[in-house]
Amino acid sequence: MSELLSFALFLASVLIYAWKAGRNTWWFAATLTVLGLFVVLNITLYASDYFTGDGINDAVLYTLTNSLTGAGIGKYILPGVGIVLALTAVFVSLGWILRRRRHHPHHFGYSLLALLLALGSVDASPAFRQITELVKSQTRDGDPDFAIYYKEPAKTIPNPKLNLVYIYGESLERTYFDNEAFPDLTPELGAIKNESMDFSHTMQLPGTDYTIAGMVASQCGIPLFAPFEGNASASVSSFFPQNICLGDILKNSGYQNYFVQGANLRFAGKDVFLKSHGFDHLYGAEELKGVVADPTYRNDWGFYDDTVLDEAWKKFEELSRSGQRFSLFTLTVDTHHPDGFISRTCNRKRYDFDGKQNQSFSAVSCSQENIATFINKIKASPWFKNTVIVVSSDHLAMNNTAWKYLNKQDRNNLFFVLRGDKPQQETLAVKRNTMDNGATVLDILGGDNFLGLGRSSLSGQSMSEIFLNIKEKTLAWKPDIIRLWKFPKEIKAFTIDQDKNTIAFSGSHFRLPLLLRVSDKRVEPLPESEYSAPLRFQLADFAPRDNFVWVDRCYKMARLWAPELSLSTDWCVSQGQLGGEQRVQHVDKPQWQGKTAFKDTVIDMERYKGNVDTLKIVDNDIRYKADSFIFNVAGAPEEVKQFSGISRPESWGRWSNAQLGDEVKIEYNAPLPKKFDLVITAKAYGTNASKPIPVRIGNEEQTMVLGNEVTTTTLHFDNPNSASTVVIVPPEPIATNEGNILGHSPRKLGIGMVEIKVVEREG
């Protein structure tokens, strides 16, 4: 209803101003600004829905001021470009319509009415309401009743008898199991669900709506609210360090806790969270690649579900035979948005909906088959009688190719339990949320029936039942939950540990690199993650007087304030204000001690603008002073005009990437010397080793042969035609996710370049 009202007010404002208000520059600018705000808000809502499937939520508030980079971003580029073009077209059209009768005399009354209607359209829009509520959640001091409802359970389970298998199905919400809406989509796992204790009304709350947040909610009974963006939690060294979570209780009760997934454990800090709360045995993409039968069988995120669940079964069998008490948690990935992935071993590889194949539904149908196969193996084993199996979604599905069909249904998260000791078939329609999952499991295992804000759905009352406005209540508790991190409010001295790549201050530890915004009684950490912009882009968003401490590789900051370090890949510390003074210090000891020293200087806006502009230069446009192309730093020497076919810098150098160009091309500003040596320090990837690699300068071509280790090759060229471009053609680029950013499409690697140098020859 509010959408219709806000649009009606918007339309009325446009029509009244265009046909009645007449000509006045001030009123035109004011009305266009407010109407433009309405457009921006609603396009933001649309874009947020595209990314999150849940409107403008807590994660969106973060990305409004930080670039979205990382997982699967290539699949969102086209919609993003479309939104920008649509926004431009709407603004141009809006301005043209409002000025249709600009030659008519100005009418104050109609101008005022049009402006008031425009303001009303903004106020009535759902986007404005969502943003207002989020902003309020950032500024509240908390809610006094948090201490009443947040309850810590006993740290042990008396006389535990049951092992636990907990399966997180990526985005595998209960809605997919509606056989009337989606016939025969989930027959295998659906049949198992129908034999279980099936909790049919598990709602999603703020701070539980992405994977690491859903894991925290289900194991600790609290939403993931933090003094930084949730997916950046890979940079912290401990995770809610004061809280008692399910893994802590299991470990204290004699359980060995295991976690198995196909993706990299570092993504979003899952490794930090699990290690902080009782898990000593973790297996992700790096740990599994030396164990699985086919290490090359991977999708954009890591190993396919069939591989992961096979390894989980092996671990279950091994642990069960040992007789020790254990918990085994596993997380699937094949149903990840926007499209999902199809394991090669499942029978259900295709699902048609609306008369055509739907990739997301196909991925769901395949993944549920793999999960069902894993569960049936456990059920058929002699150890099932001592086992509790839990199957849950980590969160509701985000915007995938099935999302518009899901939204037509009553959406809930998946949570069902199979007890080998006491088989029970029942559908429980009690109102609950993800935070109740851990408390319910704890209750079944013989522990307390509460965990944080979670309550057992078998013997307690969920917050979702107590509070009709539970979503608003959860946001009201946000400051209280953030305080559970015990995060420091000041930084005076700090220590950088080069062996561990960490910074420590005021009792907290963070992984490097790190950016800190420092103000009175607040230190805001801005880590670098797959979902956030590089730190220099985040720093560029700081105000001129904001105090900062930035710890990163020297070359990233040296261009601005310490050119002598512009080729150094060591750690450096920069601090100051973008509009004031800055200083850069080289970290030259294994344990380096530093102190903050912010000066209250006069702000220079020209300096501020220059710093911001320099920080925002994209990597390929950066230029440095050097007599060779050094590939382990961003950019290129000043003599290079442009280059292509080259991937991002890594600690050793850069790979060629045929996804960016079949050839490596380096074009210089001036013609290369008439006679010169081309000194190439490089290595080959995979089968490119020992094969001739063509290197061309103009019409002259030579070949070099590289191995899998770094070597230096010198080629002698004559350049009579004054060519200015070096071309290297990797013979057999190989698609791989090795060393890739999690969630990105595979790169096609050929040669790895460390340095290329042009040395002029006499004669």
UniProtKB/Swiss-Prot annotation:
Catalytic EC class: transferase
Cell compartments where the protein resides: Cell inner membrane
Known catalytic reactions: a phosphatidylglycerol + a membrane-derived-oligosaccharide D-glucose = a 1,2-diacyl-sn-glycerol + a membrane-derived-oligosaccharide 6-(glycerophospho)-D-glucose
InterPro entries: Alkaline_phosphatase_core_sf (IPR017850), DUF7024 (IPR054288), OpgB (IPR020881), OpgB/LTA_synthase_biosynth (IPR050448), Sulfatase_N (IPR000917)
Gene Ontology terms: cellular component: plasma membrane
Domain of life of the native organism: Bacteria
EC code(s) of this entry: 2.7.8.20
GO molecular function, one term: phosphatidylglycerol-membrane-oligosaccharide glycerophosphotransferase activity
Chain ranges passing through the membrane: 1-21, 26-46, 77-97, 108-128
Pathway this chain belongs to: Glycan metabolism; osmoregulated periplasmic glucan (OPG) biosynthesis
Membrane-topology descriptor: Multi-pass membrane protein
Pfam families linked to this entry: DUF7024, Sulfatase
Keyword Transferase included in the entry's annotation: yes
Keyword vocabulary terms for this entry: Cell inner membrane, Cell membrane, Membrane, Transferase, Transmembrane, Transmembrane helix
BP GO annotations: glucan biosynthetic process
PANTHER family the UniProt entry points to: LIPOTEICHOIC ACID SYNTHASE, PHOSPHOGLYCEROL TRANSFERASE I
Family, similarity comment: Belongs to the OpgB family.
Primary role: Transfers a phosphoglycerol residue from phosphatidylglycerol to the membrane-bound nascent glucan backbones.
Protein name from the UniProt record: Phosphoglycerol transferase I
Protein species of origin: Escherichia fergusonii (strain ATCC 35469 / DSM 13698 / CCUG 18766 / IAM 14443 / JCM 21226 / LMG 7866 / NBRC 102419 / NCTC 12128 / CDC 0568-73)
Gene: mdoB
